Amino acid sequence: KPLTTPGVCPVFLANVTFEPGCRNNWHIHHASKGGGQLLICTAGEGWYQEEGKRAVSLTPGMVVTIPAEVKHWHGAKANSWFSHIAVEVPGENTRNEWCEPVSDEVYTALG
C-alpha cells in the first residue's frame, strides 16, 4: 500500500505485508548514483537475504539498509505474518530488476 505519491513526494514509501510463507523474488534496485532501499520492520517476523550471504531474521524495530546494486529478497517467516515500511532511496537513473524466485529449498532451509 503506497504511503506517498510518486511525482508529488520525492521519497516513495509503502506499507508492505506478507502472509506467512510469502516472499518476493530476488531483485536489485539499480541506480547510477544514490538509490537503494530501506526496510523498517513494523510487525511479525521475516527474513532478509543478500546474494551470497546468510539470511537475517527480522523483527519489529529493525531497519535494513540495502545499497543500490545488491541482489536480495525479503519476506515473512513460514509461521508468521510480516510487515515493513519500504523506503525507496532517491537516486539517479533508478530502476528495479526482478529476478528469479527464491526456491522452496532455499526458503525452507531457513527454518
Where are these regions (language model features)?
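A short glycine-rich, His/Asp/Glu-containing loop-to-beta-strand
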Residues: 1-28, 32-35
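Double-stranded beta-helix
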Residues: 8, 73-111
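Short, conserved beta-strand element in jelly-roll/cupin
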Residues: 15-19, 30-48, 87-90
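A generic "binding-loop/recognition-motif" signal
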Residues: 22, 54, 70, 78-80
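Glycine-rich beta-strand-centered segment in the early N-terminal region that forms part
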Residues: 27-29, 51-54
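Short acidic-glycine-tyrosine-enriched beta hairpin
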Residues: 52-69
